[in-house]
Amino acid sequence: IVVDNLEDDITLSAALYSANVNPKAHLLAYFKDEALSQLLNQHCPNAECIPAVGAEMLAKAAVDPGSSALHQELLASTRGMTQYSTTYPESASATDVQSIFVYIKRAYQATLIAIDTGKGIELNPDLEKVILPGTKLFYIADERIERIDWSKI
């Protein structure tokens, strides 16, 4: 369920209603006001709130020229390299970041950029970090990898 309205209060109301009707749905809500994102997360911890990032992107581009083009490239879903996610299978054995990083780079020309073990996203994790089954993996690739052969790690 995607909720995006010009008025944040309407977005909040629609998101709360949607979560009440279908609590297991993947709920995305776009807010200009980060305080309302936090309020929705208090009532709906599974909601994914997308903040407005225009000011942050301007500041980043001022300090690191070209950053805005990089961010646009990563967000574009119709061209070039884009960010995707997958879950390390429950049936797989524990491994480490280095093994997954090297494997998906060689086999799929993808780059592992972050993991989420359930405690929040960790960007650029240490190569020695243990990856347990169920860990969410974030990567950059030209297209989504539909079937990763985890047995070849």
Segment roles from a protein language model:
Residues I1-I153:
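Cytosolic regulatory regions of ion transport systems
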